[in-house]
């Protein structure tokens, strides 16, 4: 071995090492991921060169990563037979950070908090230095594929500002890194711990990762010699499922992978597997679960895809790749273009990530469309589990608005069932001649929607109405304004268009309203500013009266939603509508006694409010009024 040469780290490296040792990488185990990833890159480079250069001869099946450990020495060794490094390359790669903007990077670490520190380092690809978080000393033995065995290199450092480098004899091409752990970090020097870290971060590396493993024999007693013996055992899966061609994978493999990888007991409803090449290279594998996770509505619930870079696990719950309204999707994104230590900050501000998100969103929506068309029964299960979440889509995703809402399912007057099975396309196909709006009503529950007085005339005319009774629906309809250029119309809001539909062609209604017109003035005189207006309506057939909101006013359901979330709601002044053909209205018209008339009007107004809101400010007063009317009826009959 030649005389050791002592060199100082580049000044920025000194700062970086100091920062890393004292503040970076709260998740210390990442050092092993970094070293394995570097080894994998070295193997990849050698394999690529062997394909492009016939002079370079390698055996593909011999490319491997070995992990050795020694508890007595508190050391871990990661060895590969990859491309290796020359002395010059060792100095360039391990003694300096050949990156522009390094100084500003160091400053950004110094200013930011510890959580961001863990992420910022990844921007500059300096993951190798993470070894100094857990080690007292690091040895690197390497030999470039271009050099003979006499030109091996030994690099040694304790991470305290300088390193030594010398030439050694190294028989094999490749790199061997040995780290000597600090006393406080000796737990890493354990077979099971190493195995678990590899499975967590590097299970899908393309090359075999072999760990020094104690020899075991099932139900057999080991000899003293065997107890001291070890063997090399591959611990990673190797080629990841998602990196294979779709044609090579059976459905059962997709299902089993999903259940094992995402810890789910149920088969997925559907999946989408895509390889993208070109300016961006990545693989995505998206799954729709059969059941919602128990905490999906929890504010602290984390969602997103598992992010891999070149098959190295980077992070869970990468929410930047999928919109919030698709947060039920589970899956994997494996990119060839992102830096290994990509941070969430980079993900949030990266144009390429945004483009991937656009593509993945389209793939996810197409997957759901295929499920709805080809497996309607399975789609019913999906809608039951995730429909409420998908309904957040119109407010979040204008670009995919039409593709999102065509996936929605509703209850309607057509199916006469609480089941939400009607699509907007179904509704449009059944629209009446001349109908140019999609009618809907929002309510607290199915029965109150189904039996709402606003539906009476529409049912008679066999005009379908969507029944919306999920809590989110009223809020959703602020964003869901049209479908295929057909506007939505709430039937609980006053609309001249609706009134024209309600009116019959004969003049009976008009004549009756003219005869009873004075009742409108009497009611207005009594209710005064408690109502916005009083008018006759043609929408009612069985009910004597109802209330509706004006076209530009807040609806009852929106008011309830605001109050339930602790917000203030504007006061609603209803339009009080009367059915001139109803016997009760005709009876009240003929009442001359002011007190009795007012009592009847109060009763009709309150029951209309009760039907609309589901509650009254003073229900006891309402009950008392009913009892008085019943009592007066009994007295009159006797």
From Swiss-Prot:
It holds the Pfam family HATPase_c_3. It comes from the Bacteria. It is found in: Cytoplasm. Residues 561-638 are annotated as: C. Keywords: ATP-binding, Chaperone, Cytoplasm, Nucleotide-binding, Stress response. GO terms for molecular function: ATP binding; ATP hydrolysis activity; ATP-dependent protein folding chaperone; unfolded protein binding. Its main location: cytoplasm. HAMAP family: HSP90. PANTHER family: HEAT SHOCK PROTEIN 90 FAMILY MEMBER (PTHR11528). Belongs to the heat shock protein 90 family. Molecular chaperone. Has ATPase activity. This is Chaperone protein HtpG. The gene is htpG.
């Amino acid at each position: 071995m030649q005389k050791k040469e002592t060199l100082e780290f580049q000044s920025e490296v000194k700062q970086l090492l100091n920062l890393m040792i004292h503040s970076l990488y709260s998740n210390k185990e990442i050092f092993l991921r970094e070293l394995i990833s570097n080894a994998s890159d070295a193997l990849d480079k050698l394999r690529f060169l062997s394909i492009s250069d016939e002079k370079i001869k390698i055996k593909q099946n011999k490319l491997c990563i070995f992990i050795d450990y020694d508890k007595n020495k508190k050391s871990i060794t990661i060895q590969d037979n990859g491309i290796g490094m020359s002395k010059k390359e060792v100095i360039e790669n391990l003694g300096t950070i050949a990156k522009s903007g390094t100084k500003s990077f160091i400053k950004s670490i110094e200013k930011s908090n510890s959580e961001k520190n863990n992420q910022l380092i990844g921007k500059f690809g300096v993951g190798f230095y993470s070894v100094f978080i857990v080690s007292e000393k690091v040895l690197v033995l390497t030999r470039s594929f271009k050099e003979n065995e006499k030109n091996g290199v030994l690099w040694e450092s304790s991470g305290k500002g300088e390193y030594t480098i010398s030439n050694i004899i190294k028989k094999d091409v490749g790199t061997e890194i040995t780290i000597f752990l600090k006393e406080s970090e000796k737990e890493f020097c354990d077979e099971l711990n190493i195995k678990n870290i590899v499975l967590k971060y590097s299970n899908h590396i393309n090359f075999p990762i072999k760990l020094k493993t104690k020899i075991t024999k099932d139900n057999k007693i080991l000899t003293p010699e065997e107890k001291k013996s070890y063997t090399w055992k591959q611990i990673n899966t190797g080629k990841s499922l998602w990196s294979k061609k779709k044609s090579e994978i059976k459905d059962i493999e997709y299902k089993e992978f999903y259940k094992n990888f995402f810890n789910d007991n149920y088969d997925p409803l559907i999946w989408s597997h895509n390889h993208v090449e070109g300016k961006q290279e990545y693989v995505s594998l998206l799954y729709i679960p059969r059941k919602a996770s128990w905490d999906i509505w929890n504010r602290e619930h984390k969602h997103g895809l598992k992010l891999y870079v070149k098959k190295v696990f980077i992070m869970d719950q990468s929410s930047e790749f999928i919109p919030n309204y698709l947060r039920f999707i589970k899956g994997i994104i494996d990119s060839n273009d992102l830096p290994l230590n990509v941070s969430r900050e980079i993900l949030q501000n990266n144009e390429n990530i945004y483009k991937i998100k656009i593509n993945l969103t389209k793939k996810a929506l197409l997957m759901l469309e295929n499920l709805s068309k080809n497996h309607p029964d399975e789609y019913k299960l999906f809608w039951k589990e995730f429909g409420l979440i998908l309904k957040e889509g119109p407010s979040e995703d204008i670009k995919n608005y039409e593709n999102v809402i065509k996936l929605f399912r509703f209850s309607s007057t057509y199916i006469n069932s609480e089941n939400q099975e009607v699509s907007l396309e179904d509704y449009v196909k059944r629209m009446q001649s001349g109908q140019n709006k999609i009618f809907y009503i929002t309510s607290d529950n199915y029965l109150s929607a189904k039996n709402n007085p606003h539906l009476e005339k529409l049912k008679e005319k066999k005009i379908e109405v969507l029944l919306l009774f999920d809590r989110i629906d009223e809020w959703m309809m602020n964003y869901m304004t049209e479908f295929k250029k057909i506007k939505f119309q709430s039937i609980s809001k006053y609309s001249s268009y609706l009134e024209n539909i309600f009116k019959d062609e004969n003049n009976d209604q008009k004549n009756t309203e003219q005869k009873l017109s004075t009742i409108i003035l009497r009611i207005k005189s009594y209710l005064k500013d408690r109502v916005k207006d009083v008018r006759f309506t043609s929408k009612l057939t069985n009910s004597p009266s109802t209330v509706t909101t004006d076209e530009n006013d807040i609806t009852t359901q929106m008011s309830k939603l605001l109050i339930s979330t602790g917000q203030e709601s504007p006061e609603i002044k209803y339009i009080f509508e009367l059915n001139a053909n109803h016997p009760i209205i005709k009876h009240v018209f003929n009442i001359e006694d002011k007190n009795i008339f007012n009592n009847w009007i109060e009763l009709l107004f309150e029951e209309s409010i009760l039907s609309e809101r589901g509650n009254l400010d003073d229900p006891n007063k309402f009950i008392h009024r009913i009892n008085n009317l019943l009592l007066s009826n009994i007295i009159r009959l006797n």
